[in-house]
Amino acid sequence: MSEPLRKPRPAGVPVSGLSIYQPMHLGIDEDRKRVQIELMYRNILLGGEPGSGKSVALNNIVAHAAISADCGLWLMDGKQVELGLWRDIAEVFVGNDIDHALSALDALQAEMDSRYDYLAHARRRKITPDDDYRAIMLVVDEVAYFSATVGDKQQREAFAMRLRDLVARGRAAGIIVVAATQRPSADIIPTSLRDLFGYRQAFRCTTEISSDIILGYGWAKAGYSANLIAPEDRGIGYLLAEGGIPRRMKCAYLTDQHIYSLVEHARRIRRAA
């Protein structure tokens, strides 16, 4: 692998507010070019084994949304560790309570339907910056905790159905879904769900099959397999944009101190908005 991706790339802390409609910075590719994505009207799926760097990417995404006053944060983290650092500025924070998770998804579905009623009345196709609606970013880490571990079978299935609905219908209503899993298996991320994500990012996986479950069938045989990423290369993964080919990149790293500073910065921005 090329040397530029092996060197750690600490991320700086922004000094001004952003917008969720602007591209967000994720890191650099093998040619040291900036990698940015536009998540408004899109969703992203992140997958990889424990310690592969999903949380590195996740924090970059949440950081951009946090300092965007035009975006609300709804965070779900069964372990309450990774996303817990951001909970002070989240409109909704769900820990290890499946009932709370289901009620939050119900509320978000109701908000989505209300926005579609507004759009139908206004004869419009999607929410824009001119509307009185802020974007909402729903971040779920880890999907398998809520869809395959906690609660009973009926609750887990209900969670999976509601999440799929938000991924499928939320984009035009200004609802962005960011989902992460360390269990990239077909029962956790079925093809019907994976294909709804406009962006997919695969970090180190144990097998080609696991890599393809995130990126899509056939990419491993085409030479884009996350199981070839070295275990020590945390934060390196393949990013696939809708209609493109996977791009090998390294995510910028935010320390805990960066995150604490960003939370305070975001608090000031949101207070002034």
Segments the model singles out, each with a brief description of its role:
Residues 1:
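Acidic-aromatic/histidine active-site loop/patch
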Residues 4-122, 136-223, 227-229, 252-260, ...:
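P-loop NTPase catalytic phosphate-binding loop
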Residues 24-26, 235-241:
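Short polybasic amphipathic segments
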Residues 32, 242-244:
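Glycine-centered tight beta-turn/hairpin loop motif at sheet-sheet or coil-to-beta transitions
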Residues 126-128, 225-229, 239:
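Short proline/glycine-enriched turn/loop segments at secondary-structure junctions
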Residues 127-136:
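Short basic/glycine-enriched coil/helix segment immediately N-terminal to the Walker B
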